[in-house]
């Protein structure tokens, strides 16, 4: 039986609907109000844990690190020393359910306990049907029974090791295991809230072809596009992202027909995105029925313009498939990019389209990682940021300093998320400067490196119309009179210092050469507070 036979209703505005899914089961489960949930503040979506916003200064472990509690023992203190507040760790179907119906949660329990001992929050990744476009983490009893658990075919008649997304048996087995995991997490963590989010599968999709060609897939592909899919597109036609409108527009926005008739030469990828999204959405929904933590799906990105589906995992939540995933998986609260590409700013912009909350669960762990965190959190008010392979970083890595500064600012950042009073910036390639209005003034920032060409970046928070918290490194800043507000400006006062437990602890009072015209933030991340005044 194909899973397309199962009908779902199309969702309304996506972020509203997904947030409701996070909140609705609370009363039924009897959980307290501190359970992790998503909440809207202005234009931003916040993760609320125990009634307070949590901005995740995170890191993702290497794939196999969390498969051994002994291996993790020396890693936990290192993670804490890097000033993380959240760790992203994988748990796999093959270790959780090594025999059908027999579950082993010892790793889950040990990871939760390790995080608690070091005052860290956890995001668990569910490695199951998909991990990087493959299925290596399904249990042996699934791998070896290809009759009961049918496989994806890259071409007709040729089996692969990857489970097909079109099989009811496949999705039921995955969803049952994930539901058991969520039930157990509720039992052991439903009051302490160490686990704050769940990633459902990992970089799902099909490679090296654009779609599945197994008998179930061929049958479904030849049929009309499911009515609920078309109803979603029709209902959201005016707010679809440009990529969706371009794809659908090739058929002059046909409202019915086969996949090829409606989506033309993009039909294979759209079909894959919808069927994989439906599958993962059902897995997530089964988990939320047990314990409704926020849940997301992550994407292996299109690597360059013109790259064809199948050269990256076809059907995954790449930016151009966001609307298709929203139609297919309303139980998924957000879609998240794994960013290893150079154009970090453009990718962040793509993944904030139509209200998608930005969370970056994987990113390069190079010397720019800290600046990327400043940018994502300051410019896009992201839920969090995580370099991959965090356990490979030395305790003296530069990220430690960036996370220390950001960590000290988190209460203030949370207060200003979703408002124009929080702005982030980051030097990209040959960028020389950036300007923006903030408070009652116009900020003029020049990037300047004092340590061999390293880039600059940071964030600015207007705590009052004339008072600014400035953080980051390798830039200088001045404030000019805002638009339609004539006059000259100067610094009234500048303090160097730090926030401790949300309160400002002043250090040096800067003046003279250090504060003339432009204020310089040098090669080490730091925090300054400046007050500006206007005169005729």
Language-model segment annotations:
Residues 374-485, 497-502:
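Aromatic- and carboxylate-lined catalytic core of secreted/periplasmic carbohydrate-active enzymes
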Residues 2-18:
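Bacterial N-terminal signal peptides that target proteins for export
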Residues 31-84:
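N-terminal carbohydrate-binding accessory modules
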Residues 147-322:
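Polysaccharide-binding and catalytic clefts of secreted carbohydrate-active enzymes
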Residues 282-292, 320-413:
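Catalytic-core region of carbohydrate-active enzymes that cleave or remodel glycosidic bonds
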Residues 58-67, 90-106, 156-176, 260-277, ...:
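The substrate-binding groove and active-site-proximal loops of carbohydrate-active enzymes
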Residues 71-146, 277-290:
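Aromatic-lined substrate-binding rim segments of carbohydrate-active enzymes
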């Amino acid at each position: 039986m194909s899973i397309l036979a199962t009908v779902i209703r199309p969702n309304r505005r996506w972020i509203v609907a997904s947030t409701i899914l996070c909140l609705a089961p609370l009363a039924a489960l009897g959980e307290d109000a501190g359970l992790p949930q998503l909440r809207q503040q202005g234009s931003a979506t916040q993760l609320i844990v125990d009634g307070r916003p949590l901005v995740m200064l995170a890191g993702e472990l290497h794939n196999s690190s969390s498969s051994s509690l002994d291996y993790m023992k020396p890693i936990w203190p290192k993670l804490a020393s890097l000033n993380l507040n959240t760790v992203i760790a994988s748990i796999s179907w093959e270790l959780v359910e090594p025999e059908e119906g027999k579950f082993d949660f010892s790793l889950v329990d040990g990871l939760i306990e390790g995080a608690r001992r070091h005052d860290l929050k956890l995001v668990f990744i569910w490695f199951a049907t998909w991990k990087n476009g493959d299925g290596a983490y399904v249990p042996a009893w699934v791998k070896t029974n290809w009759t009961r658990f049918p496989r994806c075919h890259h071409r007709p008649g040729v089996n692969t090791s990857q489970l097909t997304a079109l099989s009811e048996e496949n999705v039921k087995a995955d969803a049952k295991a994930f539901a058991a995991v969520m039930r157990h997490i509720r039992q052991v963590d439903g009051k302490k809230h160490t686990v704050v989010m769940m990633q459902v599968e990992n970089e799902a999709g099909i490679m090296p072809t654009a779609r599945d060609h197994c008998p179930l897939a061929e049958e479904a592909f030849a049929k009309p596009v499911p009515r609920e899919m078309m109803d979603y597109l029709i209902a959201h036609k005016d707010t679809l992202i440009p990529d969706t409108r371009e794809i659908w527009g090739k058929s002059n926005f046909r409202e019915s027909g086969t996949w090829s008739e409606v989506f033309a030469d993009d039909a294979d990828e759209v079909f894959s995105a919808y069927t994989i999204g439906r599958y993962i959405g059902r897995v997530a929904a089964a988990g939320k029925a047990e314990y409704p933590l926020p849940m997301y799906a992550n994407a292996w990105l299109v690597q360059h313009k013109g790259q064809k589906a199948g050269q990256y995992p076809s059907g995954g939540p790449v930016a151009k498939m966001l609307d298709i995933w929203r139609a297919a998986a309303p139980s998924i609260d957000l879609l998240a990019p794994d960013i290893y590409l150079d154009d970090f700013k453009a990718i962040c912009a793509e993944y904030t389209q139509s209200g998608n909350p930005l969370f970056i669960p994987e990113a390069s762990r190079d010397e720019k990682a800290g600046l990327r965190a400043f940018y994502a959190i300051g410019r896009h008010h992201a839920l969090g940021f995580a370099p991959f392979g965090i356990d490979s970083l030395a305790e003296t890595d530069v990220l430690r300093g960036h996370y220390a500064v950001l960590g000290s600012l988190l209460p203030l950042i949370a207060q200003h998320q979703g408002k124009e009073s929080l702005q982030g910036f980051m030097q990209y390639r040959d960028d020389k400067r950036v300007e923006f209005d903030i408070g009652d003034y116009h900020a003029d920032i020049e990037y300047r490196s004092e340590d061999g060409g390293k880039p600059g970046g940071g964030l600015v928070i207007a705590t009052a119309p004339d008072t600014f918290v400035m953080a980051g490194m390798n830039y200088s800043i001045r404030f000019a009179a805002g638009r339609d507000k004539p006059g000259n400006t100067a610094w009234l006062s500048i303090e160097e210092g730090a926030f401790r437990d949300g309160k400002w602890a002043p250090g040096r009072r800067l003046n003279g050469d250090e504060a003339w015209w432009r204020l310089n933030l040098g090669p080490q991340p730091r925090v300054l507070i400046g007050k500006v005044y206007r005169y005729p």
